[in-house]
Amino acid sequence: MIIDLVKRPVITEKATRILEKNQYTFDVELSLTKPKIKALIEKAFKVEVVSVNTHRPPRRKRRLGTTQGYLPRYKRAIITLKRGFMIPLTPF
């Protein structure tokens, strides 16, 4: 399902700043490629995607008592939409 692959929108200071340029930021499944991300976003939100930029943030350590591990990996995608399209980020 699309919901499982596109995990959540990112609401950070930078993500809200680039909303003015019609760019949206999502955390997506690590195995997705740029063409797959583009197809998923266009299908899910019925918008036209101009470009997709991705990056993989560094792993973060998590500690619970004496046990140490890492948080699961993810990929962050910055989606640029065609002028006139928008994605609602509020819950329905």
UniProtKB/Swiss-Prot annotation:
One Pfam family it belongs to: Ribosomal_L23
GO cellular component, one term: ribonucleoprotein complex
Gene Ontology BP, a term: translation
One Gene Ontology MF term: rRNA binding
Annotated localization: Plastid, Chloroplast
Sorted UniProt keywords: Chloroplast, Plastid, Ribonucleoprotein, Ribosomal protein, RNA-binding, rRNA-binding
Main location: plastid
Quaternary structure and interacting proteins, as annotated: Part of the 50S ribosomal subunit.
UniProt record similarity statement: Belongs to the universal ribosomal protein uL23 family.
Free-text function comment from the UniProt entry: Binds to 23S rRNA.
Protein name, entry field: Large ribosomal subunit protein uL23c
